[in-house]
């Protein structure tokens, strides 16, 4: 539920997503991404998700995404522009970093909000400053969540309105295999190691 808490804090508290907005969730197969898809949908947003395989695209759609893009086969910036009629999205949930940063900023509509909580692929990102001020964009950092938010998330999970996604549970002795699955991006949601 920590990934779900992180996604909740990003979308609800920091980006303040509203019903009717367009939200782009990067890496929907991650713990934060799979939770963000559900939270954005629960908030009444139209959700566009990215994922790295056709299987993950299907799983993102099953979680509630309205559109899902296989970023290994299609340019997600071009696809977002096509889906939104060149307008862009109101909110980008960014936690990948260097590999996606420039395109993530490019996906934003005028006045859009990019909320970031991680840098899986690196912490350096090129930003077109003209685009930042001309489109009046908002770049928002997000870290963790509050006890009150955790209580809200746990209630939504208990009520079945949010579902933390667990790909598989493995014995601790298989930690090396679990690490390999993470590095090769062969999971959807969280991997759990049991002692």
Regions found by a protein language model. Name each.
Residues 76-86:
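Short amphipathic alpha-helix with an adjacent loop that forms part of the alpha/beta core around
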Residues 7, 175-178:
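Non-catalytic, hydrophobic alpha-helical segments
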Residues 1-74:
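Mid-domain Rossmann-like dinucleotide-binding core that forms the NAD(H)/NADP(H) cofactor-binding site
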Residues 43, 51-54, 60, 95-165, ...:
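Glycine-rich phosphate-binding loop and adjacent beta-alpha segment
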Residues 24, 92-93:
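N-terminal Rossmann-like NAD(P) cofactor-binding module of classical short-chain dehydrogenase/reductase
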Residues 86, 161-165, 177-195:
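C-terminal capping/lid region of NAD(P)-dependent oxidoreductase domains
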Residues 19-21, 89, 111:
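Phosphate-coordination loops involved in phosphoryl transfer and adenosine-cofactor binding
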